[in-house]
């Protein structure tokens, strides 16, 4: 198993403070594309049974905190395609900052904005920090400033 995928779980519940800060800046999320009832960030969400990868992401602004295992590349590709194909205006993602991976090249070439978060994110109830750095990645059809803020704090 790769060191990049050495965590005991690939499910990391979204920190509520981060969601609140992002919604203040970007507007409310209309669809959480990969959630569970216990961690969905909005009223509409796709869980395992609905398989978000098989659905159209139809909302002005979607939220994505995908499973962080080996399948993460499919989620990143789906986020980029959903914006590119016009299914949604924007997909905001919380991702591990794994800039050396193949899937990160989709982020590099198609994301409108990348914000590397300082320190380690405290997921779920915040009992412990993630064993990896994180970034907020925004795929969006609108123009954004060309400079990417680094070290943004919610």
Identify the meaning behind each predicted range.
Residues 1-154:
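Class I S-adenosyl-L-methionine-dependent methyltransferase catalytic core
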